[in-house]
UniProtKB/Swiss-Prot annotation:
The lineage of its organism: Eukaryota, Metazoa, Chordata, Craniata, Vertebrata. The gene is ALOX5AP. It is found in: Nucleus membrane; Endoplasmic reticulum membrane. The chain crosses the membrane at residues 9-30, 53-77, 81-102, 116-128. InterPro entries: 5_LipOase_AP, FLAP/GST2/LTC4S_CS, MAPEG, MAPEG-like_dom_sf, Membr-assoc_MAPEG. It is a multi-pass membrane protein. Signal peptide: none annotated. Belongs to the MAPEG family. It comes from Equus caballus. Keywords: Endoplasmic reticulum, Leukotriene biosynthesis, Membrane, Nucleus, Transmembrane, Transmembrane helix. This is Arachidonate 5-lipoxygenase-activating protein. GO terms for biological process: leukotriene biosynthetic process. One of its GO terms (molecular function) is glutathione peroxidase activity. GO terms for cellular component: endoplasmic reticulum; endoplasmic reticulum membrane; nuclear envelope; nuclear membrane.
């Protein structure tokens, strides 16, 4: 890959790698809680603490593909910097959700709701990028400069 191409995706790649580390952390928590309860083997049933850790991890895993698609779509189609920032915010919120789910479940609700809003923001960025592509294609008008001006301020 040439330097310009790497420069266009490096922030997205960094956020993706951080998300992989976070997934590893969540999986480690599930494994640790399982071994604490069941000795050396992994079981899907156990105490309330294990059920909470396992459910929180599954909820995060279920939303992960959607997050990755929205992150990369928004970054490639619209603008890398705000997409990467939104991705970092999503990872922070997902961490808050995971930790909140381990305590009282109502503590996880703000993280869940804010995470949905971040996914919506990334979706709207992707739509703006697609809309801009068709504006250029049909009308020759490029709104990407306007979008970049708004997102860099």
């Amino acid at each position: 890959m040439d330097q310009e191409t790497v420069g266009n995706v490096v922030l997205l790649a960094i956020v993706t790698l951080i998300s992989v580390i976070q997934n590893g952390f969540f999986a480690h928590k599930v494994e640790h809680e399982s071994k604490t309860q069941n000795g050396r083997s992994f079981q899907r049933t156990g105490t309330l603490a294990f059920e909470r850790v396992y459910t929180a991890n599954q909820n995060c895993v279920d939303a992960y593909p959607t997050f990755l698609v929205m992150l990369w779509s928004a970054g490639l189609l619209c603008s890398q910097v705000p997409a990467a920032f939104a991705g970092l915010m999503y990872l922070f919120v997902r961490q808050k959700y995971f930790v909140g789910y381990l305590g009282e479940r109502r503590q996880s609700t703000p993280g869940y709701i804010f995470g949905k809003r971040i996914i919506l923001f990334l979706f709207l960025m992707s739509l703006a990028g697609i809309f801009n592509y068709y504006l250029i294609l049909f009308f020759g008008s490029d709104f990407e400069n306007y979008i970049k001006t708004i997102t860099t301020t």
